Amino acid sequence: MRQITTDVATLSYTNGNQHSRSNTFRSQASGSSGNSRQSGKQSKSGGSGTPTSSRSKFTEQLDQGYVPSPVPAIAPAAAVDLHRRPTYQSTGSSSTLVGSALERKINDQDPYQKHDTTERLNALRELMKKDDLDYYVVPSEDAHGSEYVAVSDKRREWISGFTGSAGVAIISKTTAYLVTDSRYWLQARTQLDNNWNLVEGGSVGGPTDWIDFLVARAKDSRIGIDARMLAHEKAVLLNSQLQAKGSKLFYPPQNLIDLIWKDKPPRSKEPVYVQPLKYTGMEANKKLAKLKDWIKAQPPTVPSYSKTPPTANQMQVGTLISNLACIAWVLNLRGDDIPFNPVFHAYLFVSAEQAILFIDPAKITEGVDEYLKSINVQRREYNDVWSFMRRKEWGDGRIIITPQTSYAISLMLTSYRYTVLPSIIEEWKAVKNPIELEGLKSAYIRDGVAFVRWLAWLEYKMSQGYVITEYEAGWRLTEFRRMGKNYRGLAYENISATGANAALPHYVPHKKDEILIERDTPYLNDSGGQYLDGTCDTTRTIIFDRPTPEMIEAYTRVLQGHIAIDSAVFPEGTTGKQLDVLARKALWKDGLNYMHGTGHGFGSFLNVHEGPHGFSSDVPLVPGHVITNEPGFYKAGHWGMRIESALYVKRVTTKHEFNGNIWLGFERLTCVPIQTKMVNPDVLSKEEKQWIKDHNRRCLEVLEPYLREDKRALSYLKKEASRDIGISKPLVKDFAIDWN
């Protein structure tokens, strides 16, 4: 029995937010009797091989690119037993959180354990019986229609045990259903207990969504739902379809889940703060003035046959904003109420005469209070919005709401006092101004620096034969991000996945799972930082050993789709949906596909998912839009791959301008090399090969000035910029030497 322990000196550093920390790393190489780590359900124990030489103490300088002399001997790859590798552990990260909600190590918690929901369902059915309900519906969203919600708003997760961000629970008198889309089918099968039936929304021959499923089952039924959690447009659709089946919706005065959720956590009291003009590019009072002018310009709601002048009650006089990101954008405020999303719970009413922010007063500091006064925004209690609506305190006229506004609000207003229009703020927010765009460029450079330093570190550690788990790899990348200027936390939970886990598009590792990164299957990392000047979202897929022909075929097709989107030139008025096929065309040639969207908009230090545009949207792309480009392929139960870069839309010059059209294209924001080991150069066009070389060389050109002090990262970057496309030819069967 033999055990080697290497202690690494403590590293202290300070990031852009002045949060300093100390971290200690420990590596262990064990003999045949040492402790083993787990990969999935299978133990990684077995074999007796170890690196041929033990290593004496070395400092964290090694992790910064400095290699002490003499360099320890490294065993040839063939001599390293991958089932018994020295371990790498990143400890103490929880002591360095930046922001109370933007970077919460939710996956530090114990892995999700399937629990018995019988008691909770029985309690819910008792309340349903009192209200004579045949069904009760529990959506994922909160009262603001948020995609990602605070812990206190995770009602569907609490009742069902399913932790995915999308899905609707439908509970009948005897049965419980969970309806979710293809991204979460495998996860739901794992997490739901025997009380639940998974309904695969969008599957072949199955229901399109939860509304389709419910309408098909409900006949002469009374269906309960919290109207606050139901969007206006969905409520109108659902009501019309249910009426045809003799069924109707019922809105209990209190949320039934809240009545039985005894240990429901309280809402955040974290203070909101002002986002400076140097990042927003436009003062809040100018945004409010623009919004007021837009309200005044909206035509009155009058019948088409009317020949009389509009009355006061037919005029559009104000708007109620419930979308949290829209409120944050208009007021140039940010908050910490929802993990990874810098927003805060509030409503905002704006008319030509006034602006009122409905918010918990505990969240308003003296400085923010003075700021609100300076932009002429009144402040009232968060829940006062309901009495304000009920009493029609603004006076005569109609209020503009969006299709996504809570149905409870439109019920309170009645149809004579509201007008439904697409969100003008979503439209404005999506088009980044020059300051926001420059901020995003800077943020993506800093995020790229962190990503490259991490890739170099990970490749080095794996080449040394270290054991690294999915969790440890993901949080090591977070540690590199923390060093960046303006860092405010993660934009979403780290997706760090190996093997079969990479086939789950929204998989998140947990600390205690201890799932090892496999060398012979693709490893996928989808992550991004929140910076004061931008929100980042990047995915790269890499492999450490020789890929199989099947992996090469799929990865090459994914990359071809990625290049096709990136290189697209299109006339003004083209929608994202019209371009979506470009990302899938190469995959379709081989009968392959992916079930998620090709890309989405994202914010300027706001939410990582932002509309209204996207590659699934009918909204035309315009200069200033930013959008992700993320085709992928997933072999369920085996491996998955995705390549994601961020783009912005700009005007381009073409050889001809047919019919006087304006032509548009994309420019890449992401500056992270793309590994070419899984690429088959024989199926690439000349232009595609050149694109890959140009991209990796551009990464070197842009990032080199920031990496001169990190020799290992710079060496990695230069290697990727000069590497030939494809893998080296095997010298012997199933074995190759990569001299790089």
Where in the sequence are the language-model features?
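Active-site neighborhoods and metal-handling regions in enzymes and metal-associated proteins
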Residues: 2-740
